[in-house]
Amino acid sequence: MEKQRSKKTKISDDLITCSGNSVQIPFDLIPEILKRLPVKTLARFLSVSKEYTSIIRNRDFMKSYLINSSTRPQSLIFTIAGGGIHCFFSLIDQGESTSSSKPTYLMNCPHLQLKTFAPSVHGLICHGPPSTLIVSSPRLIVSNPSTRRSIILPKIDANHECIYHHMGYDPIDGDYKVLCMMKGMHVYQRRYLAKELQVFTLRKGNSWRMVEDFPPHCLCHEDTPDLCINGVLYYVAMLDTASNHAVMSFDVRSEKFDLIKGGPDGDLNPKLTRYEGKPALLFPGSDYRINLWVIEDAAKHEWSKMSYDVSSTSLIRNPYFHHCVFCTNDAGEIVLAPDFVRTKTFVVLYYHPKKNTMRSVVIKGIRDRKIPLWDEASYHRIISVFSGQVDNLMFL
């Protein structure tokens, strides 16, 4: 009994002492050690002592942990639907050194009336009803795949209107804000004016707040993702009188809007992504072409336009012709994946535009999860693929 006691850890105001080995660690070094540990380990530490709990739940520590996590190699996060279940998987890209990989299962969301086209915003994902669904008082869910926990936001007074939603992060205050827009007057085809914009602050808010001043614009396709870079939320919009795509920017901290004009025209379904640190629109062209429009100067509405012919790459052959463009990764590669998965494996393609090379990675194991309805589905749909998934301690 005495031997067991000697191995216990004693925590004081200035030292942590491991008596059995006579090791003393200054208390101010403990946060530096803890923020290098995985989320699962920190979750177990919450039951060790009140001192550990106070450190891990401290807001400054959580912000520091997130910053430290963002410096590590970031993974792709897949949202895959099957049998009415949405499952989240992460995949760490090993580069050209690997030809196959098994993604890590994160969590599932068994909600039939939820759509997830939103990316991971500093580790959190916001999902809710599709914009085509009329709900009197819709509710959005914010999930943390790292902790496998979610919170339900307060009801939105939508007045029986369809809604669009986006989430951004303010790196200065460490606040997450969810932006919700009502679908207003029908303008043309699938275009509706945005009206009654509301904001919810994740840490502080108990209710939604109205945003009074915003430029008139039309909401775009519901499966067009948003993007948050350096405290600015971007989402694809359209001008009310033209066919040109535009990008709306929303400063998460100041809650100011700015419309970036000059995007591609036509009935496209572009993917908003990050390319070399800048927001960009990614969309397929004809004859095996991939188009990339990068916002070079938002204030001047300046874009650079690139088009890549991938027909010469050896991997653009059957059965990969049906792959869809999803996003870009940190290496500047364009990520392509199939819309539907009907077998135990599928292939993800990575196209490097500067090198004009294509590599493939065989993805295994997504059908191995024994989840009711999920493993019984005859096929699974890849709803979204995004880069930039990081570990986050919120909701731990």
Curated annotation (Swiss-Prot):
<dbReference type="Pfam" id="PF00646">
    <property type="entry name" value="F-box"/>
</dbReference>
<dbReference type="Pfam" id="PF08268">
    <property type="entry name" value="FBA_3"/>
</dbReference>
<feature type="domain" description="F-box">
    <location>
        <begin position="19"/>
        <end position="65"/>
    </location>
</feature>
<dbReference type="InterPro" id="IPR013187">
    <property type="entry name" value="F-box-assoc_dom_typ3"/>
</dbReference>
<dbReference type="InterPro" id="IPR036047">
    <property type="entry name" value="F-box-like_dom_sf"/>
</dbReference>
<protein>
    <recommendedName>
        <fullName>F-box protein At2g21930</fullName>
    </recommendedName>
</protein>
<dbReference type="InterPro" id="IPR001810">
    <property type="entry name" value="F-box_dom"/>
</dbReference>
<dbReference type="InterPro" id="IPR017451">
    <property type="entry name" value="F-box-assoc_interact_dom"/>
</dbReference>
